[in-house]
Each structure stands twice: as C-alpha cells, then as structure tokens.
Amino acid sequence: MGELAASANHGHSPCYPERKGTPGDLSKRKMLVHFYPRRHSHPRATQQWILKNKTLCRRIKE
C-alpha cells in the first residue's frame, strides 16, 4: 500500500500548470497532508514551496 501511494504521488509538484490554482487543486493538497502526515513534518518548508510555485504560476500567466 505504501509503495502504491508513494508512486501515485510521485512527480507531482504543488503547482499544476494545466489548471492554474483551481480550488480542487487546494483540496487535493489538503487530502495529501492527511494521507501523508510523515512527509509533511516540515510545514514551513512546504509553505515556502507553495508560495514559490504560486509566484512561478503568476509569472507564466503574464
């Protein structure tokens, strides 16, 4: 089970270029936090990642 979940989550960055910042995108991230509590042991680091990706998306849009 662990292997399957890890492979399913693999290769997905917090920013989805095909759907830029959709609400479903955010709920999916919340679900991941619930499913992988061990992975999210550094909330500050993940927050920085999300912020970085948000700014990247904005630059791509412009």
Curated annotation (Swiss-Prot):
Per the record, which residues fall in region Disordered?
1-26
Basic and acidic residues composition bias: residue spans: 17-26
Q: What is this protein called?
A: Putative uncharacterized protein encoded by LINC01546
Biological source species: Homo sapiens (Human)
The primary gene name is LINC01546
